[in-house]
Amino acid sequence: MRASPHCLLALTAACCNAPALAAPGDPIALADGVTLDPILALKVRYETVEEDRPLEPADALTARVQAGFELASGAFSLLVEGEATTELTDNFNNTIPGNGRTGFSVVADPENLELNRAQIAWRDGASSVTLGRQRIILDDARFVGNVVWRQNEQTYDAVRGQTAIGPVRLDATYASAVQTVFGADSPNFRFSGDLVFLNAGVKLPRGEVTGFAYLLDFDTRLNASSNTFGAKAAFRLPVGPVTLNAKATLATQSDTGGNPVGYTARYLQGDLGATWADFLLGAGVEQLGSDGGRAGFQTPLATLFAFNGWADLFLRTPDAGLTDTFARAGKKFAVKGLGTVDLLAVYHRFDSDFGSQRYGDEIDLSAGLAVGRASFLARFASYRADGFAVDTRKFWLQTEIAF
């Protein structure tokens, strides 16, 4: 179902026409122990894409509204949220078949109108159970996330249970379907199957150790069916005015279900960083391995934009695998009377895991400003090809406000 600016306005009005006397974003008391919490978020983004191949540059201006409510009484709650995305320009390929725009580069933000979340939940202290269409983000979203960067959010039809016993936390989910970022008009919008997410962690004085198992058996997305088992550790160590950070992850993945390719591949990640007086420095290596060039380690449910470069050249791991060697530097500072500025620069070198192939390198730059509930963001990514894909440049301007 396609959205329009009128859909956006209707959703916004429905959320904002709540009883008065409550500040934006504050729960509204309806009765003794019963509250209504309006949900409203608006994101407007301008994105350009230039590729060194015979395609017209993409020039996309899109807007997204998420609007709804959460009704709570005691330990129980009901949450309903709609999502509408509209295209304010059409000079880009939105990935929808038959759109007549295949001569443009891709910006995967099609017009869309959908029920984004519809869930009931029970919570008692550190324990909770959530049933329905919901947002799921596990750890840093490297394996399971909501793809928050794109306009259409990725959500799951699932039952999820969480609890904590002292320093130990447990998280288990069974999902029967995932709604992707491609919108309701796309054949790639919804994938059903038997999806199991198991995640458990132990908090330590200076960090946390986590074990996980992600079992993905899709009904039709067969080449994404896999079993992944792994562990990760993250630690922080203050040394005078400097805080040192270290992260490491090890995982193994193999085919399952109807996957037509039999393979086993490993995942390795190591990251060292330091912060001092709002300065950030860090470097690391992430390797999505290959099984002899037959297939690479895949993370089909991840928030992929956050990893392996913002130019999105590696949303699917090549069959020869991927080794991403990266370094980053950043700085946060407050501007009096304005807000908090966040600057970040990242360099990536990309190589294969199998076959000693160079893929290229990339520079990513970001500048953000947070002002109360609003945020403003400018980003730039420049990928320089070396035997893989083509030179690609992307630029974004974005503003967002949420209540």
Residue locations for each model-derived region?
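Cleavable N-terminal export/targeting peptides
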Residues: 1-32
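Beta-barrel outer-membrane channel/assembly domains of diderm bacteria
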Residues: 21-133, 159-164, 233-246, 250-251, ...
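Sequence/structural signature of outer-membrane beta-barrel proteins
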Residues: 45-51, 87-89, 136-147, 175-184, ...
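Outer membrane beta-barrel
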Residues: 61-183, 194-208, 268, 272-304
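Extracellular/periplasmic loop regions
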Residues: 93-108, 245-346
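Outer-membrane beta-barrel translocator/channel fold
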Residues: 177-183, 207, 215-220, 242-270, ...
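Outer membrane beta-barrel transmembrane domains
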Residues: 192-222, 228-235, 306-317, 324, ...
